[in-house]
From Swiss-Prot:
Homodimer. It comes from Escherichia coli O6:H1 (strain CFT073 / ATCC 700928 / UPEC). The gene is dnaJ. Participates actively in the response to hyperosmotic and heat shock by preventing the aggregation of stress-denatured proteins and by disaggregating proteins, also in an autonomous, DnaK-independent fashion. Unfolded proteins bind initially to DnaJ; upon interaction with the DnaJ-bound protein, DnaK hydrolyzes its bound ATP, resulting in the formation of a stable complex. GrpE releases ADP from DnaK; ATP binding to DnaK triggers the release of the substrate protein, thus completing the reaction cycle. This is Chaperone protein DnaJ. CXXCXGXG motif repeats lie at residues 144-151, 161-168, 183-190, 197-204. Binds 2 Zn(2+) ions per monomer.
């Protein structure tokens, strides 16, 4: 029975470049791999064909011979009749694909980078707006100062793992397929510590608390995060340290509310000032300032004081302070005050005075119309 053309087996043209051949091989090998088709003889035979075609077409000398003579170039035993031996570089083809599937992966496992740490910092609004420097104390893992992170007793060195010979990987055969797995002896590090450090017991790190000075820039707000590079936990066996992230939480203020770079506050005034107008003092983060209140001011009126808010943490313009007026109803009136208010109300023409209380008139006119419509 005539053998199928190698190019046809891989589904590539005769002018295909090596990267196209590798791509086609990877796709087909994954599809017909024996571990994915256990007990399927056809898939097993197909996989052998794919492997054989790949070995020929990725070897420049064998490919040239095949292009000139076809399968006859290898009929005298040049290919050795199939099987899984030969020169196919499976670590190159499957290192990233099958590494996760079969627990392998290429190369020695790198020592793990230190873990990142998080510190929640609570600030007052004044501290957040102006900026502040604070000292914090955090528990962490630091590099052992005796072995300097190696884990080995001073005067000794980590030894090359005899199982994987320093590669961190061991090769396992599963049917027709050879896969690499993390060395169980050294856990992928490629080295073993025969004489561990007495202080860190071979870990290369020790538990310790450290104090840091953290500069908080002006303008930060709840949810902002400040990164201190390299201030997290020390890495394993000399690997880089992680980072420390300071998470900002701004306390609720008794007077001001913050929205972005603007501040809001409520300013209570009595109804006489609301009607006649006047001048009051309002608080800001820099002290008290005077605010002119025009006559006939209603509850909810906003007065904007430009530049009295928060400076952006990213630079640029400063926010504003917005004062919301709340007109207070007087309480604890004496008889004389009640009499004066009664006279004032009568001068308005009653509770729905049309001229002096236009909103009241509009409201009661609407109520009257509503009930009139119901009775029709």
């Amino acid at each position: 029975m005539a053998k199928q053309d190698y190019y046809e087996i891989l589904g590539v043209s005769k002018t295909a470049e090596e990267r196209e051949i590798k791509k086609a091989y990877k796709r087909l090998a994954m599809k017909y791999h024996p571990d994915r088709n256990q007990g399927d003889k056809e898939a097993e035979a197909k996989f052998k064909e794919i492997k054989e075609a790949y070995e020929v077409l990725t070897d420049s000398q064998k490919r040239a011979a095949y292009d000139q003579y076809g399968h006859a170039a290898f009929e005298q035993g040049g290919m050795g009749g199939g099987g899984f031996g030969g020169g196919a570089d499976f670590s190159d083809i499957f290192g990233d694909v099958f590494g996760d599937i079969f627990g392998g992966g290429r190369g020695r496992q790198r020592a793990a980078r230190g873990a990142d740490l998080r510190y929640n910092m609570e600030l007052t609004l004044e501290e957040a707006v102006r900026g502040v420097t604070k000292e914090i104390r955090i528990p962490t893992l630091e590099e052992c100062d005796v072995c300097h992170g190696s884990g080995a007793k001073p005067g000794t060195q980590p030894q090359t793992c005899p199982t994987c010979h320093g590669s961190g990987q061991v090769q396992m055969r599963q049917g027709f397929f050879a896969v690499q797995q993390t060395c169980p002896h050294c856990q992928g590090r490629g080295t073993l510590i025969k004489d561990p450090c007495n202080k860190c017991h071979g870990h290369g790190r020790v538990e310790r608390s450290k104090t840091l000075s953290v500069k908080i820039p002006a303008g930060v707000d709840t949810g902002d995060r400040i990164r201190l590079a390299g201030e997290g936990e020390a890495g394993e066996h000399g690997a880089p340290a992680g980072d420390l992230y300071v998470q900002v939480q701004v306390k609720q203020h008794p007077i001001f509310e913050r929205e972005g770079n603007n501040l809001y506050c409520e300013v209570p005034i009595n109804f006489a000032m609301a009607a006649l107008g006047g001048e009051i003092e309002v608080p800001t983060l820099d002290g008290r300032v005077k605010l002119k209140v025009p006559g006939e001011t209603q509850t909810g009126k906003l007065f904007r004081m430009r530049g009295k808010g928060v400076k952006s943490v990213r630079g640029g313009a400063q926010g504003d302070l917005l004062c919301r007026v709340v007109v207070e109803t007087p309480v604890g009136l004496n008889e004389k005050q009640k009499q004066l208010l009664q006279e004032l109300q009568e001068s308005f023409g009653g509770p729905t005075g049309e001229h002096n209380s236009p909103r009241s008139k509009s409201f009661f006119d609407g109520v009257k119309k509503f009930f009139d419509d119901l009775t029709r």
